[in-house]
Amino acid sequence: MTDSLGTWRARTIVATMFPLLVALSILEMGSGYVLEALEATYLDNPTLLILVPVMIGMGGNLGAILSSRLSTRLHLGTLEFSPRDEQLWASVAAIMLLAATVFGALGVAAWVLGRVVAEPMALADLLIISVGSGMVLAVLAVVLSVAATYVSYRQGLDPDDTTIPVVTNVCDILG
């Protein structure tokens, strides 16, 4: 494949993104089947219906934030794919702290809304589900962001075009 870093031609972007987006769309359909299979669980615990969609979106958002930062650093020439890259670790720490804060707040918000619209789950249970699964999703988003940026770079693709769709779609599936 030709090196698309530094090029902004529509043809190059479409040629890169079209097959990727088709594959990711097919994978997204699979996640819909998983959600459908869990329908009974969600109907038994309506508060989860409040929690799950937001968690799915938030995992992708966290991955998109890190992917954007990594892509910018790559274009500026300051990104090192090294375990000693202090800026990379600072970005990862920021994402993890943001995840803990957001998923904790999400658990409380789901509990409050659950009290209004349905029979709520216990706050402790919601916090364990929200923060626990949210942090696992955040770790996966971090790993996916770094891997997608690295693979894009090694393949000569512009990570601005590839990383965010890959990370957000995979986080949607894993969420």
Model-derived segments and their meaning:
Residues 1-40, 111-128:
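Helix-loop-helix hairpins and the membrane-proximal interhelical loops
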Residues 59, 155-157, 171:
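Single, functionally critical "micro-switch" positions that shape active/binding sites
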Residues 2-10, 46, 50, 80-92, ...:
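Juxtamembrane loop-helix boundary motifs flanking transmembrane segments in multi-pass membrane proteins
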Residues 26-35, 39, 105-113, 117, ...:
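Alpha-helical membrane-inserting segments
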Residues 25, 126-146, 159-175:
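Hydrophobic alpha-helical transmembrane segments that form the multi-pass transporter/flippase core
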Residues 13-101, 134, 169:
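Hydrophobic, small-residue-rich transmembrane alpha-helices and their short perimembrane loops
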Residues 65-83, 144-164:
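Juxtamembrane helix-loop transition segments at the membrane interface in multi-pass membrane proteins
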Residues 94-113, 123:
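Short alpha-helical transmembrane segments in multi-pass integral membrane proteins
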